[in-house]
């Protein structure tokens, strides 16, 4: 959509423009049998024209009456505006802009906008090639002329998505993706939508994204729609249909490996009784391995569950990747021999590296392959679920680290004590050596000092005689 603007430049009074639109609609409908729109609204337009020509400022009560009469005129004009889709291609945009301008002068524009958006979401017979782009341009104008907090934007946005969905316009959807990623959540909060409207909006985005070929965005918004279902509605038929759609998408889309958003959904949990086989398959993909999957499909063929047989290869490949992720997360030594991987995945040994690389690309593990040692050294592995067994594994690893740290601390403590002992011994030895050297030096000084004092006294005595 274009940069937001609240300006739509059209000159003329309400009565003049409404009369012009009525004549134009009557012209388009000239081959139809309906009565004249202009004739229907003429009495109300005469009253409005008198009030518009009055030089006196209308009082509050008069202003309310003006708005009421405008609304009555607009009810007839907006219903008749469905004919604008048959207008010549060059005139469609101008005609709808006139409708938008008139609607904005009503007491409640939101009363009319959903119907206008519904018209714009339908094809333009006069412009089969450029009709969708014209409709998107007009809808963008409506969206941008509304205040950001106006919840009428919700209906306009649904119409934009409907046009993209019906035309499979990849270019239009790509232009919208940035706003979907950056602004949709804030729009939902600003428009103050209830759960049903939030669900409807996310499903509209999901459908448009799927038509445009963006399966990942489509799946993400299906999950968001699923999460918008209130617990009180989780067992309804609509919730069950959406839950089945989300679950089948998660199983068959090759990029989905995290099933937590599904298992935490009340609507999905209700499938435990409504779709027991499908729910059991989800539990296998969420936390089990290839062995459990192969046992399951022996007793419950994929063809018996919503045509999943068509995706049998995708399901098996995904299960192999998930099994390898579980294997990497549970190995205590962080080293996975090629033979162990080959056995767990039911694949030839020479294919091990391919499957490890696929699992790395899926973001489930990180590590280093060693062809020389025939092993995969795990640097990081993602737990598919985190329950009692995983906590036990973490506890075991923490105990190993604790013992290792205790051993390191023991070595450090021993070395510290040894260092202190050696330091004390060295200090004592240095002190003892210093005492012995001092004693020898003192005796020599005394001997030298005694001879020096006797000489002078003898000289003094001789000199005295």
Swiss-Prot record:
One Pfam family for this entry, by name? eIF3m_C_helix
GO cellular component terms, semicolon-separated: eukaryotic 43S preinitiation complex; eukaryotic 48S preinitiation complex; eukaryotic translation initiation factor 3 complex, eIF3m
Q: Which UniProt keywords apply?
A: Cytoplasm, Initiation factor, Protein biosynthesis
Q: Where in the cell is it found?
A: Cytoplasm
From start to end residue, where is composition biased (Basic and acidic residues)?
Answer: 433-448, 455-465
Kindly report the protein's main subcellular placement as a broad class. cytoplasm
- Alphabetized InterPro entries for the sequence: COPS7/eIF3m (IPR045237), eIF3m (IPR027528), eIF3m_C_helix (IPR040750), PCI_dom (IPR000717)
Domain of life, per the record? Answer: Eukaryota
Sorted alphabetically, which SMART domains does this protein's record hold? Answer: PINT (SM00088)
> Region entry Disordered: which residue ranges?
429-465
Any one Gene Ontology molecular-function term assigned to this protein's record: translation initiation factor activity
Q: Which GO terms describe its biological process?
A: formation of cytoplasmic translation initiation complex
Give the PCI domain ranges. 215-383
Query: Is-annotated flag, keyword Zinc?
Result: no
State the similarity comment: Belongs to the eIF-3 subunit M family.
General function of this protein: Component of the eukaryotic translation initiation factor 3 (eIF-3) complex, which is involved in protein synthesis of a specialized repertoire of mRNAs and, together with other initiation factors, stimulates binding of mRNA and methionyl-tRNAi to the 40S ribosome. The eIF-3 complex specifically targets and initiates translation of a subset of mRNAs involved in cell proliferation.
HAMAP family recorded: eIF3m
Do you know which PANTHER family this protein is assigned to?
COP9 SIGNALOSOME COMPLEX SUBUNIT 7/DENDRITIC CELL PROTEIN GA17, EUKARYOTIC TRANSLATION INITIATION FACTOR 3 SUBUNIT M
Subunit and interaction comment: Component of the eukaryotic translation initiation factor 3 (eIF-3) complex.
Indicate what this protein is called per its UniProt record. Eukaryotic translation initiation factor 3 subunit M
Classification from the root reads:
Eukaryota, Fungi, Dikarya, Ascomycota, Pezizomycotina
